[in-house]
Amino acid sequence: MDPNTVSSFQVDCFLWHVRKRVADQELGDAPFLDRLRRDQKSLRGRGSTLGLDIKTATRAGKQIVERILKEESDEALKMTMASVPASRYLTDMTLEEMSRDWSMLIPKQKVAGPLCIRMDQAIMDKNIILKANFSVIFDRLETLILLRAFTEEGAIVGEISPLPSLPGHTAEDVKNAVGVLIGGLEWNDNTVRVSETLQRFAWRSSNENGRPPLTPKQKREMAGTIRSEV
């Protein structure tokens, strides 16, 4: 096993522990708490994949961080922070919408790279909007936290989420997954639109009808994928 993979996991475990202590003292806002919950699932998945115990990894991560902090001067820390571009966290969904449990009458699940797509194939003839919470950097989508499909009545009928066992994804991964979800929902004569915020930062453009600018080739590929999976 790559030692860098192990040390990265150990540091991530310790930093999660620190953030959890911050949350326990009620010092975290909604985006902070949301990332904390998502990262916990991701760490569990990575730990299972790597065969590493999280508690043991957390202790090892603490030692790594303490060693780095002893070697780091305040001036070097300031320069490092100044050189790192800051990402922003954008929210289409409320914390309640993100944390709400939902069920499917006719469940369908598909893995597209590092993302998991779930949808209820029982939903027909509905107007649906896709909302997402994600981070952006340099005005481009950086990391998808969670995307969900909502009917006009507020019911959740679809979802795209990162796979805990496969951390890391690109904006292109997200766009492809959105295309698959749209194709699956439209297969049952639903009308789907994407939030303006997601269109702006994933596609850097938006349409009045709420559709991202998918190419004809992408549309054919997405529709074909759904038909072959149904």
From Swiss-Prot:
Residues 180-215 are annotated as: CPSF4-binding. A motif (Nuclear export signal) lies at residues 137-146. Gene3D superfamilies: Influenza virus non-structural protein, effector domain (3.30.420.330), S15/NS1, RNA-binding (1.10.287.10). Disulfide bonds: none annotated. Residues 205-230 are annotated as: Disordered. It is found in: Host nucleus; Host cytoplasm. It comes from the Viruses. Residues 223-230 are annotated as: PABPN1-binding. It holds the Pfam family Flu_NS1. GO terms for biological process: symbiont-mediated suppression of host cytoplasmic pattern recognition receptor signaling pathway via inhibition of RIG-I activity; symbiont-mediated suppression of host gene expression; symbiont-mediated suppression of host mRNA processing; symbiont-mediated suppression of host PKR/eIFalpha signaling; symbiont-mediated suppression of host type I interferon-mediated signaling pathway. Inhibits post-transcriptional processing of cellular pre-mRNA, by binding and inhibiting two cellular proteins that are required for the 3'-end processing of cellular pre-mRNAs: the 30 kDa cleavage and polyadenylation specificity factor/CPSF4 and the poly(A)-binding protein 2/PABPN1. In turn, unprocessed 3' end pre-mRNAs accumulate in the host nucleus and are no longer exported to the cytoplasm. Cellular protein synthesis is thereby shut off very early after virus infection. This is Non-structural protein 1.
